[in-house]
Structure formats: C-alpha cells, structure tokens
C-alpha cells in the first residue's frame, strides 16, 4: 500500500497544506522546528487516530484554531481508499470511503504504518507502559478485533476500579461479576498478544541475526501477572490471580493483575537486552522494526508504510545499508532529515520536499 495524497488543515504548524507523494521514497528536508516531524505525525495520526508524540489531542490542533482535519488517499491492491479524520474539542470523527465509522476497530487497519524514531530506544529500557503501547499500536493495525477486545477490557477495568474506589460497602457478588467479565476480555487480549509476540520473535530473530553478523540471537518474552504457561487454562489462571489479589485490590483500590500490568522483555543471547550497549539497543530496535514490516506483510499481504523520523544519522553504515535494502524494495518510505549528507546511497526514484514554516515545497520549488 502507499499514501498517494495527504491534506492537512490546522494540524500543528500547518494551516492548510495539500501534498502528493512518491509511491517509493519521500524525504522531508529542513531545519529543526519547521514541521518535518509534524508531517510524519499527521500520517501516523491518519493511520491510527493517535499521535506517537502526545496523549493530549488538543496539542495537535493549530494554536489559534479549535479543530483540525486530515484526509488522505491510500492505494492498495484492492483499489483506492479515502480516509478522513476530523478532531474537535468534542472528540474525533473518522471516515472510510466518506462513510463515518462508529468504532475505532472499524477504522484502524485501512492504512498500516511502521514508525522508527530516536525515542524508540525507550522500547528496550523505558517503562512497561511504552511496550504495552507498542503492542497495542502494532497489533491493532493487523488485527482490528484486538482493539475491540482491548476497548471492552479497559471499559470493565475502569468500572472495577471505580467500584473499588467508591465509599460504599463492597458487594463481593457484584465484584465477582465484574471479575468474570474482566477475565473474559482479558484472556482474549492476552491470547492476541501472545500470538503476536511469537510471530514478532520469529521474524525479529532472523533480522537481528543478520544485523549482528550472525553472533547475536534475539528472543522476546511476554511477562504477565497471570500464569500464562498453560494457554488452555488461561481463564482459570486469571480467576485465581484475581482472587489472590482481591485483598490487595480492596486496600489499594485498583486492580493489580491483568494485561494492563503486563510487559515484554527482550533478550540477546539469553541476557536481558536492557543491560546491553547503545549500539546493541539500536540494532535490536531496528531488527524489531524490520520484523514488523515482514509480519504485517505476511498477515495483510500489503506492505506497510515506513516512517523514519531523523534516524539515519543515528545509524552506522551497516545499519543504514540494512535499512536501505528494505527501502529499495516495494515499500513506501518517508524520511525526515536536516541534511542530505546523512543519507547515503538513496534509491534514484525519490521525491524531496523542503519543509519551512509549516509549508512543503517539492524539490525545493
């Protein structure tokens, strides 16, 4: 798939911009704070209805406006698909083929993206919430039912936590009803995640072995607050975990076990990767990103769109060449950079957009 056209209206520092893209390589060139990353963020937001840079949607709206509008035309093997997002103070409206979508899971997945940014190193050494978000964003694109199950789980979780925080006497029977619902959706979420991690590890191990000159083996482990060793009895394991945690939950007035507490760990040759070098972290994250591309292709039969936010200058020649190998294949890529000097051996079929003060000019014109 590839993004043919993007229209931004009052998004970040863009007042109104319309831009047609190259199906292969697109480079956003400009000084810092001109809007290069904002352009990538707009593409990411159009795909996922979420920003990778802020949790506060109003930060995306131009400072002197009250709403924003994004639209794009995605080309796929099955034809073209118009996508739209309108964001106001009241919330967001999403459209596919000009038809309003009722649920997030009905919208996400029509355009798949893989983002690689400097802050992705936090995937290895950052907080567990960063890794859970990573799973949610990537898995949600290739398996829309996951977003539906996750939304339902979070809804029940919020109900349970609100009830635990209430001043009224706790009704154990009602709490058990909530627990049953939490177990139902929680097991669905965990099963989706376990399947995703297994596939990601398979693709990632091969990529990392190549990147490390056949000396490092990558493995990924899903760390759960629930016993996940026996998937056939996952529901029973979750129930037992909730029962054991009940006195703790009543005291702390929140839910201490479940997929909202889970994490993933990365290992290099059996050792915790978080203790590795900066170079190992870069290689590992690059391996994961390249694995994501292959994983998405294997499931959707479409190549995702690759977004590279000022990462080429962070990579040595070996890693750059590996990334450029991927770019030279049939995958649309967007790169931000302050200088073309950072980009070596680029494919010939590319478009360069000069970004300045929230405006984009193709080939500097």
Curated annotation (Swiss-Prot):
One of its GO terms (biological process) is DNA synthesis involved in DNA repair. It holds the Pfam family SMC_N. GO terms for cellular component: cytoplasm. GO terms for molecular function: ATP binding; single-stranded DNA binding. InterPro entries: DNA-binding_RecF (IPR001238), DNA-binding_RecF_CS (IPR018078), P-loop_NTPase (IPR027417), RecF/RecN/SMC_N (IPR003395), RecF_2 (IPR042174). It is found in: Cytoplasm. Its main location: cytoplasm. ATP binds at residues 30-37. Signal peptide: none annotated. SUPFAM superfamilies: P-loop containing nucleoside triphosphate hydrolases. Keywords: ATP-binding, Cytoplasm, DNA damage, DNA repair, DNA replication, DNA-binding, Nucleotide-binding, SOS response. Belongs to the RecF family. The RecF protein is involved in DNA metabolism; it is required for DNA replication and normal SOS inducibility. RecF binds preferentially to single-stranded, linear DNA. It also seems to bind ATP. This is DNA replication and repair protein RecF. It comes from Streptococcus pneumoniae serotype 19F (strain G54). The gene is recF.
